């Protein structure tokens, strides 16, 4: 009888331990349900600041005067702040272990958009953003499928960040790309030009397709690369130094200088007499 009582006690203790473990496991189990948070907005959003390794989707919602945030991480990891004039900040805390989680941001933002992302954020947009757009990416962040029309665009990338499939239709384009960062243009159309300048530093890359009916300025140093055979240029100013490699297509003239092991391959240009090339560099015509 005593042995039977002892066995029953052992069974009850084992059952209690298993039950406690299951309760603890359920308590610790991550809630993967996509949650929503509505952020009241007074007027247009002009600036979006993203910090953290998010997969971010920014879509336009013209029927709502608020920003709707969707996410699948604990709410304690998120801080949002909206302040005038139109600045929305979204920050993630305790970033370890939540890489690849979802952050979707639906906003009414058709103009005056400024995006800043760092610490590995991956941003995708839908819709056409008008007027000016300034984009600042650092810490291996990404911006994908961005479309900007009817204004200027300024891109500043560092820390191996990337912009992929950018569409720009306007008259003022500036890009400052450093630390192995990359910009790829799906389409650029500039029929008139109040400014077009691309600067590459430290093995960065600029590529794409389209047409620029003016004279942009390409500046590159330290092994950077221009892959722009598919961008039809009217003319071009170049300043390359330190092993820069460039492929360009220009219908009129190319002028500027190549130095310290840089190489320029070009198509179509009718006049290259104003390009100075040092003894370590070369310029090659592609038929």
Placement of each model-derived feature along the sequence:
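Short, surface-exposed interaction patches in beta-rich subdomains
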Residues: 166, 181-287
């Amino acid at each position: 009888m005593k042995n039977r009582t002892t066995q029953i006690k052992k069974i009850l203790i084992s059952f209690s331990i298993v039950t406690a473990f299951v309760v603890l496991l359920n308590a610790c189990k991550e809630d993967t349900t996509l949650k929503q948070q509505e952020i009241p907005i007074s007027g247009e959003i002009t600036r979006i600041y993203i910090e953290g390794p998010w997969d971010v989707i920014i879509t336009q919602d013209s029927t709502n005067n608020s920003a709707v945030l969707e996410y699948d991480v604990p709410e304690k990891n998120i801080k949002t702040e909206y302040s005038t004039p139109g600045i929305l900040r979204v920050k993630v805390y305790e970033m370890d272990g939540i890489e690849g989680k979802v952050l979707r941001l639906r906003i009414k933002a058709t103009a005056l958009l400024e995006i800043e992302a760092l610490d590995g954020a991956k941003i995708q947009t839908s819709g056409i953003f008008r007027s000016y757009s300034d984009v600042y990416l650092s810490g291996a962040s990404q911006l994908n499928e961005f479309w900007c029309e009817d204004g200027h665009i300024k891109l500043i990338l560092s820390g191996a960040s990337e912009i992929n499939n950018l569409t720009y239709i306007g008259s003022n384009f500036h890009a400052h790309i450093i630390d192995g960062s990359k910009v790829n243009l799906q389409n650029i159309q500039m029929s008139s030009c109040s400014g077009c300048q691309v600067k590459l530093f430290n093995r960065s890359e600029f590529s794409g397709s389209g047409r620029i009916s003016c004279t942009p300025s390409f500046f590159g140093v330290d092994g950077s690369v221009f892959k722009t055979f598919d961008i039809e240029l009217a003319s071009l100013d170049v300043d390359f130094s330190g092993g820069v490699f460039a492929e360009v297509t220009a219908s009129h003239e190319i002028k500027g200088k190549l130095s310290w092991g840089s190489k320029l391959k070009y198509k179509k240009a009718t006049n290259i007499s104003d390009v100075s090339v040092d003894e370590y560099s070369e310029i090659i015509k592609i038929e």
